[in-house]
């Protein structure tokens, strides 16, 4: 009989919790760019691996940065 593969996906690590970041600052554009796609959309939790609490912090910081003009609403072609 053929053997079956048993491969599970590795759980993604919450970047914010792993680096002990308490406050996600909207002015920290380099951090926020980790959580944005090439098209400028906020990446979901299943892609980034963040917890629900930290995902809310990231989403609010990204939205704030967009309003302040630090991040684009849409990607440039």
Swiss-Prot record:
Any single biological process term in GO: translation
Cited InterPro entries: Ribosomal_bS18, Ribosomal_bS18_CS, Ribosomal_bS18_sf
Keywords linked to the UniProt accession: Ribonucleoprotein, Ribosomal protein, RNA-binding, rRNA-binding
Superkingdom to which the source organism belongs: Bacteria
Keyword Zinc in annotation: no
MF terms (GO), sorted A to Z: small ribosomal subunit rRNA binding; structural constituent of ribosome
One Pfam entry name: Ribosomal_S18
Stretch forming the signal peptide: none
One GO cellular component, as annotated: cytosolic small ribosomal subunit
Subunit structure: Part of the 30S ribosomal subunit. Forms a tight heterodimer with protein bS6.
Protein family (similarity comment): Belongs to the bacterial ribosomal protein bS18 family.
Record PANTHER family: 30S RIBOSOMAL PROTEIN S18 (PTHR13479), SMALL RIBOSOMAL SUBUNIT PROTEIN BS18M (PTHR13479:SF40)
Known function: Binds as a heterodimer with protein bS6 to the central domain of the 16S rRNA, where it helps stabilize the platform of the 30S subunit.
Protein name, UniProt field: Small ribosomal subunit protein bS18
Organism: Lactobacillus helveticus (strain DPC 4571)
């Amino acid at each position: 009989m053929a053997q079956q593969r048993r491969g599970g996906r590795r759980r993604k690590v919450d970047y914010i919790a792993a680096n002990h970041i308490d406050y996600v600052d909207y002015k920290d554009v380099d951090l926020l760019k980790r959580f944005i796609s090439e098209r400028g959309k906020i990446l979901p939790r299943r892609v980034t691996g963040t917890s629900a609490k930290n995902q809310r912090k990231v989403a609010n910081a990204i939205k704030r940065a967009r309003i302040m003009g630090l991040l684009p609403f849409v990607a440039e072609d």
